[in-house]
């Protein structure tokens, strides 16, 4: 059973998703079939508290298990600010790496102001073997972002929507890991930008919400649905690779 092994671990963190935005938590409008399936087959938490109501400190709290202020971050971090997750803090990936896990991070970092600069620690300094990230939000929007950095190297413009880009980076890393080191467990931190603004969504999904009172609502609904589809891609890859039953999959916001 899962308890007898060192399971793989996938943690998916959304940005600004409300607890009432998923069908499995009572939403009657937004289609989230993959997350509904995950909730139906697992444990659905009804009492959960973030370490902070804003972005950067909540991420620091998740990664360290500490009150964010104690780890050096007390508010969201604007670009260029001399604030960052303190070097030397113990994190989930750093401790799992010590335990023999391979580690990957893909998506929104937002734990420092001077992203991909040598005078502040970067994702790799906190235990991630491979990282593919932005400092803050996908820019100029979720569509065709151009601010990703892969393990210290700028990627440039990437076609597609951020959540699919992040999901496919994650899947590609997992596939390579399983092919080369199948006996080594892995930890994958998937930090979607969705549905934080600036929002953009596939038009075919936007058109699927004709009863929305305004286009902005339809864009948001479609954004959550598109994120759900990206979760489905990751879940499908775990099934295809035959490792789903030995993978602890956690979704939160």
Locate each region found by the language model.
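Formylglycine-dependent sulfatase
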Residues: 1-253
């Amino acid at each position: 059973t899962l308890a007898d092994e060192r399971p793989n671990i996938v943690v998916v963190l959304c940005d600004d998703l409300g607890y009432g935005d998923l069908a499995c938590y009572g939403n009657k409008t937004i289609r989230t079939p993959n997350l509904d399936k995950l909730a139906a087959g697992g444990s659905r938490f009804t009492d959960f508290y973030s370490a902070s109501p804003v972005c950067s400190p909540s991420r620091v709290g998740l990664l360290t298990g500490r009150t964010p202020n104690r780890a050096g971050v007390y508010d969201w971090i604007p670009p260029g600010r001399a604030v960052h997750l303190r070097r030397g803090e113990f994190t989930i990936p750093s401790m799992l790496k010590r335990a023999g896990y391979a580690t990957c991070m893909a998506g929104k970092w937002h734990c420092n102001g001077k992203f991909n600069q040598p005078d502040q620690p970067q994702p790799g300094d906190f235990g991630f073997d491979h990282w593919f990230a932005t400092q803050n939000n996908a820019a100029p929007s979720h569509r065709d972002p151009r601010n990703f950095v892969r393990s210290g190297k700028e990627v440039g413009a990437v076609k597609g929507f951020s959540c699919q880009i992040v999901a496919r980076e994650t899947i590609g890393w997992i596939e390579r890991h399983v092919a080369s080191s199948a006996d080594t467990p892995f930890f994958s931190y998937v930090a979607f930008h969705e549905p934080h603004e600036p929002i953009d969504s596939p038009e075919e999904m936007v058109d699927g919400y004709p009863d929305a009172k305004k286009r902005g609502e339809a864009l948001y609904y479609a954004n959550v649905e598109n994120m759900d589809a990206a979760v489905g891609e990751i879940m499908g890859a775990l099934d295809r690779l035959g490792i789903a039953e030995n993978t602890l999959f956690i979704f939160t916001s």
